[in-house]
Amino acid sequence: MKALILKEAGVDPAFDLVQIDDPSVSEDGVVLEVEAVGVCHHDISVMDGTLRRGVKDDVILGHEIAGTVVDVGPSTQGIKLGDKAVTTLTTSCGLCETCLGGLEYRCPRAHGLGHGTDGGFAEYISVRRNNLVKLEDHMDLIGASLIACPIGVTVRALEDLCEVSAGQSVVVFGSGGGLGVHAAQVASSLGAEVIAFTRSPNKIQRLQELGFGQVFLLEEGLDPSDLVYALTQDLGADIAFNPVGSAVFEAALRCLGNGGKMVVLGEVEGNHSSVNIAELIFRDGSVIGSSGAGIRHIESACEQVSSGIITPVVEARMPFEEIVQAYKLIKSGDVFGRIVLIPAGKLTRRENT
């Protein structure tokens, strides 16, 4: 099979599109023919050298994987040839206390796909059945590649960690990015009032067309908390969703009302943020870190995408051969939602959706 291998990380990463052996199916696993794989900021951070710890040499990146089952192990149950499926974000043993407690994404034996073990920037991938979620036949595999991440990741952050409920106010920063644009939809589906911010004027209309709530341009010098308090009758937000990280950390904190929660995810660069601790103390506020998604979050995301509650946002489909162009586009910050890669030969040119 053909696979895209990261040969050298750095400001200008180097890749090789190489021919390697097809993967073999495990006793209790499947081989998935990869139809689409999203490019996550995690992938970008490995490409540019920011993330190094635990990264496999000559790694095949990609953890946002959707495809079709083309081989099934003799002990594999609940899935058959031709079924559509998405992978989890990490491997897991399925047997330890952590896995049995529903926290398989924290399995001590886990390896991140496209990080500690090879991922989906290839024509095929072999995974165990417990690291796979079956899709409905009618589902589009391009959009489905975003189900585990970013959609499942935002489901975990908002449903489980923040416990968003109907009538609450949720502020979403970075709402034009992969995490933000789906978090806004998840929050809206939970009945929350969504206030979304983006720094990109060209994303405003497209965000508004998704119909999840109010969208504002975060211009230089604007304090978003002034707007948030004006829109919430001076109560402040119940939740601030912050996938941007340190750059808006203090601003997001100021948006919170009493007992508010800020969930932070996405940023892995290790940047520091200056914070007025009193802003947290006198709000009885909470700051929650979040990463990953479990089977139940991915299954929830599948149901919401299948029913049309959440729309996967794909800016462009690009062939493996255009990985450097995809990298540059994502680094520019101009991508709305995600770029999805298509295995070599299945797509010969970039297509906007």
Spans of features found by a protein language model:
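Glycine-rich beta-strand-centered segment in the early N-terminal region that forms part
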Residues: 22-37, 50-97, 136-139
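Glycine-rich cofactor phosphate-binding loops and adjacent beta1-alpha1 units
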Residues: 162, 195, 205-288, 346-353
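Mid-domain Rossmann-like dinucleotide-binding core that forms the NAD(H)/NADP(H) cofactor-binding site
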Residues: 139-221
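Residues located in well-ordered beta-strands
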Residues: 2, 33, 66-68, 193, ...
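NAD(P)H dinucleotide-binding glycine-rich loop of Rossmann-like/cofactor-binding domains
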Residues: 93-174
